[in-house]
């Protein structure tokens, strides 16, 4: 966890971008939910290597995200199943890839927010971390 500069102040960034499984996503969401924050934002990339169960596993995480997040951004074809299972007010945006998601997420973050970035390595969520921290890291 580290603080990043955003327009008008700072936000908390939780970088869990290296790997993702159903259990680790749920654990990450619990960490996000425990943070004192104005809003809790979840940036989620596909969990890869789930086989035929991939769509259902992604959709099942919507219940957790709905309870623990205020806003959800997704990228990749599998995360679309989670995204569309959420109530419309929680949908920040769905994008084809992390490169497309990064600027929209950056623009959405406000002072006092806590942001969890999570996805399988192949989802390239590290691109988002770089976009959020480039020359902006506070601590």
Label every PLM stretch briefly.
Residues 1-139:
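ATP-dependent carboxylate-amine ligase
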């Amino acid at each position: 966890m580290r603080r990043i500069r955003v327009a008008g102040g700072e936000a908390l960034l939780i970088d869990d971008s290296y790997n993702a499984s159903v259990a680790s996503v749920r654990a990450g969401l619990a960490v996000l939910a425990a943070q004192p924050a104005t809003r809790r934002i979840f940036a989620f990339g596909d969990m890869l290597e789930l086989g035929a169960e991939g769509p259902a596993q992604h959709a099942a995480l919507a219940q957790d995200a709905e309870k623990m997040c205020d806003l959800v951004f997704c990228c990749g074809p599998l995360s679309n199943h989670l995204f569309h299972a959420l109530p419309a007010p929680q949908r920040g945006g769905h994008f084809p890839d992390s490169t497309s998601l990064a600027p929209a997420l950056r623009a959405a973050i406000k002072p006092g927010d806590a942001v969890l970035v999570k996805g399988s390595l192949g989802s390239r969520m590290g691109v988002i971390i770089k976009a959020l921290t480039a020359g902006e890291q506070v601590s």
